[in-house]
Every structure is written in structure tokens, then in C-alpha cells.
Amino acid sequence: MLKEYRTVKEVVGPLMLVDGVENVKFDELVEIEIQTGEIRRGRVLEINEDKALVQLFEGSAGINIKGSKAKFLGKPLEISVSEDMLGRVFDGLGRPKDEGPRIIPEKRLDINGIPINPVARNYPSEFIQTGISAIDGLNTLVRGQKLPVFSGSGLPHAQLAAQIARQAKVLNSDSKFAVVFAAVGITFEEAEFFVDDFTKTGAIDRSVLFMNLANDPAIERIATPRMALTTAEYLAFEKGMHVLVILTDLTNYCEALREVSAARKEVPGRRGYPGYLYTDLATLYERAGRIKGKEGSITQIPILTMPEDDKTHPIPDLTGYITEGQIILSRELYRKGVMPPIDVLPSLSRLKDKGIGEGKTREDHADTMNQLFAGYAQGKEAKELAVILGESALSDVDKQYAKFGDAFEKQYVSQGFTTNRTIEETLNLGWELLSILPRTELKRIRDAYLEKYLPKEKSKE
């Protein structure tokens, strides 16, 4: 039998203190009935003897301490899951937001999930085609990987997220592919863009959308990514789907953590974020992966904006320690009109070697990737030298590298947000660009591949 407590002692920001409680558990769900009869929800954040600290999801505005009642429900925050969620839009707490019918659940699952036993994990090894050359060709995404996008304020990460969600697929696989998209603390304009883009392109048919808006309570932001990941785990490990989870913008999630931490008067860590930020982020990122004996998988692309474009800020810094690489968006490329403005040199996919090559992409993938990286790096150096010494100071080879660098940005990296390139098109485009350079400079590609793939009429001896 559930007890109802009228012993609310204090409300501070999103937190409520309830006195005289019995048999209450950490993370337990709470229903608060305020004096108007409105029901609000919260969860137990801390227990000390007979006192429970409750975190309110809908905020504390309008709560009268004397007229409020708290009921502890004996279970954690859960989400109702079903395959019928595909094609639907939900709010940050998993409630339908698209005026569609209520979901009839096949299961109700704890949003905190169950940690995957490291021994049960399967190593990521299958190529995921995003249709974006800068990712597919140079920083390959592998099924089961967690690969974040580091963006900056004002950069087009929303368009990139929508493009990946629309175009991503696993090659040579009969399994169903699904996208779980969670937007955390976004504006009305961004929410409208995502819903319209998914709907117009038909991508919504294979997607589940969770939308937490900027005017929703900050506490809800802490639950939204977990709602999305729990849904992804259900679709992947119980329905055998390949699930791509896109989380944007996790900077807003971390700001919500900092807000709750400050309300609890915890000792702050770097830049005011809680000392457990690393651990908390790990509870999200480590829910990606593959499990032995299970057909499905979860691949994660968390997107975060770096405050002041600072890679050493705690959020991107700690994210980089947990995840397997990063895709970095460049403000310089954005000003040049390169879309998407992916800076391939500091970007990295630590698992790319496992998802490319014969039988996965193409035999020449690794060699061309290395040569494109080297050529672009040398092209940037040549252009920097020309700025200092003048173009006349460059050798003929340096001029060709500078030409290659410009062509690489305009043709390879820049493709717009609607072009969907196959991996064959990406690799062939790479060869076309490499033909700008003298053949003697292509030292990272074995001769057999040069003979087979280098365009004969363009290559220079």
C-alpha cells in the first residue's frame, strides 16, 4: 500500500524536501499533488534517515508547502516501449507530442537501463554509410561505435544531424535500421525544423523522436537522453534492429546537471560542473555497442556545442575520454561556405580501421584515406607558406598541393546537406582529386591500386 505524505518541509528551485518518510529508495518515482489538484512528478535524489530529497520534473513554480502531498510509487522512472513508437514524436519524458494515439506498451522499462557486461560485448566491425564523404571516406562510422560531433554555437550541427538521420544505413545487411533522435533543450525553431525534415523526407517512418524544448524544466533534460537510449536498447536487443541514436545538444544536458548540482549545494568541479560529470556522461555513452548472440546494435552520435569553440572545455574534454573519436565542425570552413564544415584533420574515428577494406567498403579505402589526409595537410601548409612568402616562392609541387587542398574542400568535404553519396562515389571522388597531384607524390598508395583506380587521362607522371 502506497503512503501519502503531507510533510513537505522545503522547496528550493527544482528540489523538494519531504520529512518523516519510510522505506523510500534512491531514484524512486514520486507524485506530488499541489494545492490546485495538479499532479507533478519527481524522483528521489537523496535519502538521509527519514528525509527524502526529491527532484521535480515539472519545476516548483506555484507549489504551496502546506497544501502539497507526496506519494512515493515504489518504482523508478519508466518508459512504455513498443515497435509502434517508430514514426512518432514524444516529449522529453516519453509522452506523445504528435496528437497520435497513446502507445500500448509491450513493456515498461527503467530508463537507467542495465549495464552491458564487458565480456558480453562484441567488437564493432561493420561499416555504416552516412552518405557524407568527410565521415564515410576519412572518419568512418562503425556499427556499435560512439562517435560525437563537436560543434560551436551558430554552426549547422542541426542540419548535419538531420542529414545523418535521413541517410544512414548499414551496407550488405538485411536487418532493419532505426533512428532514435533525442533533442535536449532546443528552441521551437529547431524542433520545428527537425520534425518537418523527418516528415517531408519520410525518415520519420523509421525514427522515434524525443523533443525536450528550451522552455521545458531543466530536470526533464536529464531524463530525455535516457528515455531515448532505453527505447534504442529495446529496439536493438529485443527486436534485432540496427539503431542509430543521435543526441543533440548534450551541452544543454550538462548545464541541467550543473543547475541541479548547484541547487543541492554540492562542491563544484571544473567551471562549476559537478565532480561526477565524467561518470554521468559515461552512463549515457557506454549504452552504445553490440552484444554477443544479439543481432541488433546501438550506434551513438552525441552532438555538443563547445562553449567559445574551446576543445578543452570540460564537456568536450570528458566526452573525448569516453567516446571513440570525434567529428569537429570548423568555423573557418563555415565562413568559406563549405557545407557541412567538417574539419577532417583534427577529427578522428578510432574504430575506422575495423569497418573498411575489402568486403566492407573497398580494398583501396585505407590507402586512399591516408593519402587524402597527407595531401590535404600538405596543401594547407603550402597555402600558409604562400600567405607569408607569396605564391611565387612555392615550388611547382607545392602549387599542386595548394590546388589539391582547395579542390578537396570544395568538392570532397563540401557537398551540401541534401547530397547522399555512396561509398563508391566517395572513393572515386577521392581518386579524381588525387590525380591533381604528381603520381610520384602518391607514396601512401600501393602500386597495384594506383594502376587499377587512378584515372589514367588525368594522372601526372
UniProtKB/Swiss-Prot annotation:
Signal peptide: none annotated. GO terms for molecular function: ATP binding; proton-transporting ATP synthase activity, rotational mechanism. It comes from Clostridium tetani (strain Massachusetts / E88). CDD domains: ATP-synt_V_A-type_beta_C, ATP-synt_V_A-type_beta_N, V_A-ATPase_B. The gene is atpB1. It comes from the Bacteria. InterPro entries: ATP-synt_VA_C, ATPase_a/bsu_AS, ATPase_F1/V1/A1_a/bsu_N, ATPase_F1/V1/A1_a/bsu_nucl-bd, P-loop_NTPase, V-ATPase_su_B/beta. Belongs to the ATPase alpha/beta chains family. This is V-type ATP synthase beta chain 1. Keywords: ATP synthesis, Hydrogen ion transport, Ion transport, Transport. Gene3D superfamilies: 3.40.50.12240. One of its GO terms (biological process) is proton motive force-driven plasma membrane ATP synthesis. Produces ATP from ADP in the presence of a proton gradient across the membrane. The V-type beta chain is a regulatory subunit.
